[in-house]
Amino acid sequence: MAASQQQASAASSAAGVSGPSSAGGPGPQQQPQPPAQLVGPAQSGLLQQQQQDFDPVQRYKMLIPQLKESLQTLMKVAAQNLIQNTNIDNGQKSSDGPIQRFDKCLEEFYALCDQLELCLRLAHECLSQSCDSAKHSPTLVPTATKPDAVQPDSLPYPQYLAVIKAQISCAKDIHTALLDCANKVTGKTPAPPAGPGGTL
């Protein structure tokens, strides 16, 4: 009985020593490594893409070659459709190859034109705001696309917000003063304010 117990314990210990790894089973699992950060050209390419998304002029320059290619395709498809319709009217056999639809090419061309128009409008609006900012607040403010290009005389953004709020308050005061003066001249009594802040 003791011999059989010794044999059973020896067999169990041998099985424990061999284990799943010795039998060809999977070993210890490796921990997943975190994704590598973008460095070098990849990071610069990402920054350039972000600048193109923010800058309407860069996006306009990027869309111009696409517009030229779309116009060439549109003219080519129009010529092919015209030739095919002429051959059909004359009773001749048309080409067996598939021909692109003219309306699809025209729709793509107009879509690119709409994008270019939006870019030009946005660029014009940015230029107008820049001119107004340079006129009423000549101190520079760091932009979101170039946060590192901070000059010594630049104005911090919180302080810039305070300046803008002061300008808005001054504009409201001027508007109220002009409205009171106009009411006194015409003899009208001013209407009571609709809320705590009043109405403009």
From Swiss-Prot:
Tissue specificity, in the record's words, reads: Widely expressed in embryo and adult.
Q: Which InterPro entries match?
A: Mediator_Med29_met (IPR021018)
Taken from the UniProt entry, a GO cellular component term is:
nucleus
Q: How does it assemble?
A: Component of the Mediator complex, which is composed of MED1, MED4, MED6, MED7, MED8, MED9, MED10, MED11, MED12, MED13, MED13L, MED14, MED15, MED16, MED17, MED18, MED19, MED20, MED21, MED22, MED23, MED24, MED25, MED26, MED27, MED29, MED30, MED31, CCNC, CDK8 and CDC2L6/CDK11. The MED12, MED13, CCNC and CDK8 subunits form a distinct module termed the CDK8 module. Mediator containing the CDK8 module is less active than Mediator lacking this module in supporting transcriptional activation.
Which family is annotated? Belongs to the Mediator complex subunit 29 family.
Q: Where is the composition biased (Low complexity)?
A: 1-21, 36-48
Instruction: Identify residues that carry N-acetylalanine.
Output: A2
User: Where does the record place it?
Assistant: Nucleus
Whichever gene encodes this chain, its name is MED29
Q: Name one GO biological process term.
A: positive regulation of transcription initiation by RNA polymerase II
Top-level taxonomic group: Eukaryota
What does the UniProt keyword field contain? Acetylation, Activator, Nucleus, Transcription, Transcription regulation
Q: Which protein are we looking at?
A: Mediator of RNA polymerase II transcription subunit 29
Its primary localisation, in coarse terms, equals: nucleus
Which residue intervals make up region (Disordered)?
1-48
